[in-house]
């Protein structure tokens, strides 16, 4: 079924307020979740609300966080987020990074002790809309076997990038460092669909197509994805003095406790390196040239990274956002959550 962006936003916001989140914070979380669903990233959209509601109601997401911004240098800062909702903390951290980069050319802002922040391309697009280049990366709970390994160590540790072209054009790139994000498995479960056997392994280490049998995810491109997730864990965890590797908290164990996750934003002002106008012209030229490339057999069009999601987002603004009926029924119900997510860590060793 399809519903309007405004309706979905209000339903999510109301449910999170029902769980105890203040209206301002609930609106921000809803904004990021609706953004994800509108772009077809259903793994990071409304499917997450029931889990968020349970964690908020049990105190694992701080309803009254005390944010503290520590400016550690002219271009660097740490936002101590007090286990606030991750979307709220990440958006706030990016706002500071944008101001710093506008003045000083570059900014590096770490967000320390936060919750799950959802689709992190939302935050790099904040920078791009301000005419800046945005890069963001964050930790995730352990659910991935390292290349060549049989035990879980790292999370999906996503990485996102966005840069402005001419007008309102934005080039966006957002990826998990696994073949697919855990949320894609959750989405497959909600739709009763199988998954490709290249995404994950079962408890015996064998490839599986059953999303309910997933025990561990696989790194993207083997050793390359493994190296990227290691780098992201270092920059968003070790660098900020936070738990790292398999010490990162599980999304599903003890929903009464804060996640203590880390995220790192890097923002670059093109005007400090060349000309913002020239940069934007060349980026738009890149996008047009990629679209003009002859497609390979089996493809109708070459898209630049993120273009397919841009198209879906524009369509959603007109046609509405696709949502699974079970999720819609939950959102309009009085239930805070139907099935507890606590202690259901599918990656427990």
Swiss-Prot record:
Pathway: Nitrogen metabolism; (S)-allantoin degradation; oxalurate from (S)-ureidoglycolate: step 1/1. Induction: By glyoxylate and allantoin under anaerobic conditions. It is found in: Cytoplasm. The record marks 48 as: Plays a crucial role in stabilizing the binding of (S)-ureidoglycolate. The keyword DNA repair does not apply. NAD(+) binds at residues 140, 174-176, 224, 306-308. Keywords: Cytoplasm, NAD, Oxidoreductase, Purine metabolism. It is an enzyme of class 1 (oxidoreductase). One of its GO terms (cellular component) is cytoplasm. It comes from the Bacteria. InterPro entries: Mal/L-sulf/L-lact_DH-like_ah, Mal/L-sulf/L-lact_DH-like_NADP, Mal/L-sulfo/L-lacto_DH-like_sf, Malate/L-lactate_DH-like, Ureidoglycolate_dehydrogenase. Disulfide bonds: none annotated. Pfam families: Ldh_2 (PF02615). PANTHER family: MALATE DEHYDROGENASE, OXIDOREDUCTASE-RELATED. NCBIfam families: AllD, PRK15025.1. Belongs to the LDH2/MDH2 oxidoreductase family. Homodimer. AllD plays a pivotal role as a metabolic branch-point enzyme in nitrogen utilization via the assimilation of allantoin. It is able to utilize allantoin as a sole source of nitrogen under anaerobic conditions. Catalyzes the oxidation of ureidoglycolate to oxalurate. This is Ureidoglycolate dehydrogenase (NAD(+)). It comes from Escherichia coli O157:H7. The lineage of its organism: Bacteria, Pseudomonadati, Pseudomonadota, Gammaproteobacteria, Enterobacterales.
């Amino acid at each position: 079924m399809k519903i309007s962006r405004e309706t979905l936003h209000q339903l999510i916001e109301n449910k999170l307020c029902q769980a105890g989140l203040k209206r301002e914070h609930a609106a921000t979380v809803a904004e990021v979740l609706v953004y994800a669903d509108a772009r077809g990233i259903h793994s990071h959209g409304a499917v997450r609300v029931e889990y968020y509601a349970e964690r908020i109601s049990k105190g694992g997401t701080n309803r009254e966080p005390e944010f503290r911004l520590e400016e550690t240098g002219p271009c660097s800062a740490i936002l101590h987020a007090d286990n606030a909702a991750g979307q709220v903390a990440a958006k706030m951290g990016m706002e500071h990074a944008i101001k710093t980069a506008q003045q000083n050319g570059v900014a590096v802002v770490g967000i320390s002790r936060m919750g799950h922040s959802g689709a992190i391309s939302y935050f790099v697009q904040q920078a791009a809309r301000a005419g800046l280049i945005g890069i963001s990366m964050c930790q995730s709970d352990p659910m991935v076997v390292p290349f060549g390994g049989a035990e879980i160590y790292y999370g999906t540790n996503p990485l996102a990038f966005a840069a402005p072209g001419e007008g309102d054009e934005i080039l966006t790139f957002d990826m998990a460092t696994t073949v697919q994000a855990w949320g894609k498995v959750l989405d497959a479960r909600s739709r009763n669909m199988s998954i490709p056997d290249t995404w994950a392994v079962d408890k015996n280490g064998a490839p599986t197509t059953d999303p309910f049998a997933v025990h561990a995810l696989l790194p993207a491109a083997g050793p390359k994805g493994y190296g990227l997730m290691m780098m992201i864990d270092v920059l968003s965890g070790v660098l900020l003095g936070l738990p790292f590797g398999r010490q990162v908290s599980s999304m599903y164990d003890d929903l009464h406790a804060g996640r203590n996750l880390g995220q790192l934003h890097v923002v670059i002002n093109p005007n400090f390196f060349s000309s913002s106008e020239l940069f934007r012209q060349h980026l738009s030229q890149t996008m047009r040239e990629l679209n003009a490339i002859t497609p390979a057999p089996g493809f109708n069009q070459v898209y630049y990274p993120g273009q397919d999601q841009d198209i879906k987002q524009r369509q959603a603004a007109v046609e509405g956002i696709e949502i699974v009926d079970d999720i819609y029924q939950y959102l309009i119900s009085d239930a805070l959550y139907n099935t507890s997510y606590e202690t259901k860590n599918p990656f427990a060793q």
